[in-house]
Each structure stands twice: as structure tokens, then as C-alpha cells.
Amino acid sequence: MIFRPSLLILSLLAGHALLAQYNGPESVEYDPVGDRYLVSNTGSGAIKVRDQSGTVTDLVTVSPAPYGLEIIGDTVFACSGGGIKGYSITDGTLVFNHSVGGTFLNGITTDGTFLYTTDFSAGRIYKVDVAQDSHTTLVASTGGSPNGIVWDPVGERLVVVFWGSNAAIRAYDRNTGAATTLVAGTGLTNIDGVTIDCLGNFLVASWSPDRITRYDPTFTQPAVDLGVTGLNNPADIDFDTVNGRVCIPNSGNNTVTFFEVNCTTGIPEDLRDKTRSIVPNPARDLVRIEPPLAANTPYVVMDVNGRLVGSGTLSPNALLDVRTLETGTYTVVLTGTGTRLRLVKE
């Protein structure tokens, strides 16, 4: 059963950083282990780190300048010219460097095993095997300028957004490269980024208008403007499933916007219970909620991609068994109150 509660736009966070902090921000990638954000900067050629307090520091300088970012494990992979480079998210050490012979790699995503990257200028999509340090051309010609790309684990497809007037949205099979048109003409010009929110909806960032637009998972319902203000050429967006935020780099004014949405019951943010925590954390086997719950409480567990991996009801003082979860970061949502708790599984 897929958990699909109602969605409520809560607030526009004060996510605009000082202009000096960013220089051509292109891509934001949420790091769930560090609970922070990695931001590629095409102007300075740097990948920067923004923590939850708003402090911005440098992780590493990349040449050619970094565009799309994607994290697998402890490595952040960056589109850099005609290749992909991987850096330790701990200290910025270069750990992977593979050329695909591309022209201008722009967007990047992963299905957990392979990387998939768009070549904006050549109109191609490449599939990169990190373990084997090899690649193949998945799509030799998309017939346009592919930009943002995201792996859809529910539909088992690559969803790609395109540059240009009345831009299209297409899906591609990760094994054969076979294409399916999801939206032939969006009415949007220059779609830069795409991500998936906590409800399985697709969010796309366009330059004209400057907007974040939501599509339902089937792409059959009318598109919805999220109403995010202050955007200026929004680029390669991401969704922070732990904190429920759309992460938006504004390449036009050197800022990053965080727009928070309610992924659970529609309870206003200021009425949510923020006093509870998971103990112990990180954990390997059994955890408990502190302070104890007052009554039987339904819950769901979501992974960093927003996928439902567990659900049930917790009674007061009950222990939650997390032994079957794979190593990684998860969000435990108490659906009755909207409380979101971060869990790190060792």
C-alpha cells in the first residue's frame, strides 16, 4: 500500500543566502547523513556545503565547473565538462574520474547502481557503471536538449525534462533507452531541473516563467504552480525528504531557496510536536520514541528517495525493530501528528 496523504504548502523559508556565498548555483543535492546541502557553483567552479544553520563552506573546487550533482553512499558525483567526477563528501578527495566523451553533461541521477547523465549539447543520455569505471550510450539522440533527469523508483523509469520553448517531459527505459512522451508541450520554456516529492509527485523548475510546477505521478492531471516566490532562473532542484523541502538553486541571482511542504496530514508547522526523538540514533536493531507516546500512534518509514519502506502502529513504550532496514538514513513519520523523526541505520 502506498502512503499518499494530502499535501499542504506551508511556508517559504528564509532560504536566500548572501550573494557572496554562491556564484552561479546550478544544482542542490541533499546529504541525508550529514543533514546538509551540497551546491554546485558554475561561476566559481566549487561544490559548496550549506548546513542547517545557513553556514556555507567549500568542499572542493572542480574543473571544468560542476553542474548536476548526485550522491551515492559517501561520494558526490558531479557533471564536469564531458565526464563525471566523484568526490568524498567528507573531505572532497577525488575518488572517481570517468570521461564519457560528452560535450556538455548537465543533469545526473542514479537508480542506486548506475549513474545516468544528460548531454545537453549532444542530445544524449549516458549510463555510467561506477563499479566497472565504464559507460554506454543509453540514448543516442533524444531529439532535443535534455537537461534535468531523475530516476523514478515507482515507475521504474528515467524522467527527463527538456530545454526550449513549450518544453517536453519524457520517460526513458533504463535498460533499452526506449522513450515515452509524458507531456508533449508543457507551456513552459527552458525546464532546467526535475525531482520527486514525498508524495511521488514530479516537480520541475522552469526559467520562463520562473516557477516550480507540480505534476501528478501519471502526468494526466492539470499541472499546479507551487507558488514559490523570489525565483530567478531556478536550476537543478532536489527534494529533501527528511525535512520536507524543495531545494532550489537560483542561477540568476546567486541564491538558494528552500520551500517547505507538508508531506503528512496538513497540520500547520507551528502546531507539530518537535520535542520527540528516536533513541538510540544511529541504531542497529531496536529503537524507541522519547518521550513515550501517549496513545497508539500510526507511523510510516520513508527512505531518502521518499519511498515507503515500512508502516504500522506504535503503542506507548513500544520498541520499533529496524534490523531489516538497509544501512542509510530514513524518516519516521508519526502520521497522526505530522511529526517527522530522522533515523540513521548502521
Model-inferred region functions:
Residues 22-34, 42, 62-74, 78-81, ...:
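Beta-rich, blade/repeat-based domains predominating
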Residues 21, 54-61, 93-99, 134-140, ...:
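A short beta-strand motif characteristic of beta-propeller blades
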Residues 50-55, 88-93, 129-133, 173-177, ...:
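Short loop/turn segments that connect beta-strands within beta-propeller blades
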Residues 1-24:
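Bacterial Sec-dependent N-terminal signal peptides
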Residues 45-48, 84-85, 123-125, 166-169, ...:
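Structural signal for beta-propeller blades
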Residues 261-279, 285, 307:
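Residue-level detector of functionally pivotal "anchor" positions at catalytic/ligand-binding pockets or at interdomain
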Residues 301-309, 330:
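Short, glycine-anchored, charge-dense loop/turn motifs used at functional sites
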Residues 311, 327-346:
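C-terminal tail/sorting-segment detector
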